[in-house]
């Protein structure tokens, strides 16, 4: 088996059973294409989401190193920070979060509701900064200060997106391949591409397990020119960790994230409303709404390689709906 080296890495089990892979009958009828969805929005901690897969590996490494504090960074409405804080609470660890306000809003819901509200429930120590201009350096500086206070910090990068964390999505590719085997031949897979770990992990896993399926990353924060090296660098780092080759071309669409990261747009919000009304499934304004807008437009514009079934990776994020009201 090509991914046997995954078992070499310490891993905590937070998710348990595979997340559902479901057919969307009403949405498929609406689009005239078979659409399936991988429900990583229902992972069983802190209102779900994809980062829990990464944290199974990252938190295991933190415990191996003897850490008593998890440190990470993100936007005020970061899904990753929320899930990291929940994992810290579950493991009895302290959590320090370095947060920015990337959209410069003073709206009370954004500043206090949604993911930010949940951080308080998890007893997270919040440190604000003007902007995460160099998050790796800023996290190291924060870790130095936390260590000086007598803690043993473990730094988790933005999005949990390093080679170790991204192994969670190599593992996810294995899960997807097993669920599809003998049931459906997926032609294309669509995922939001942000901090790049989910996209890169899937790219490595699917190349070896479902090589006939194309993987499309819909960017949520950057142009293709800026996002491509992030995904490729992680793809190669993951492959090196697993002693695999990774030669599949990284495919990115950057037509759907304007006006910028964390700012809702009309097509993304229409996608959120459409899936809610047709299937009772909640997307979010920052990641999955924009990625689903890409899927919908990609069908309309015939951007996919053929007319076969499409799998959408639902990475979660519904808590942000409350923060972005009244945009929603």
UniProtKB/Swiss-Prot annotation:
One GO MF term attached to the UniProt entry: D-cysteine desulfhydrase activity
What are the alphabetically sorted keywords of the record? Lyase, Pyridoxal phosphate
Reactions catalysed, as given in the entry: D-cysteine + H2O = hydrogen sulfide + pyruvate + NH4(+) + H(+)
State which Enzyme Commission number(s) the record gives: 4.4.1.15
Give the function comment from the record.
Catalyzes the alpha,beta-elimination reaction of D-cysteine and of several D-cysteine derivatives. It could be a defense mechanism against D-cysteine.
Q: Which cofactor does it need?
A: pyridoxal 5'-phosphate
Question: What assembly does the database describe for this protein?
Answer: Homodimer.
Family the entry assigns: Belongs to the ACC deaminase/D-cysteine desulfhydrase family.
What name does UniProt use for this protein? Answer: D-cysteine desulfhydrase
Broadest EC class? Answer: lyase
Question: Which residues carry the post-translational modification N6-(pyridoxal phosphate)lysine, per the record?
Answer: 51
What the entry lists under NCBIfam families is as follows: ACC_deam_rel, PRK03910.1-1, PRK03910.1-3, PRK03910.1-5
- Organism of origin: Escherichia coli O157:H7
The biological process GO terms on file are: D-amino acid metabolic process
Enumerate the InterPro entries for this protein: ACCD_DCysDesulf, D-Cys_desShydrase, D_Cys_desulphydr_bac, TrpB-like_PALP, TrpB-like_PALP_sf
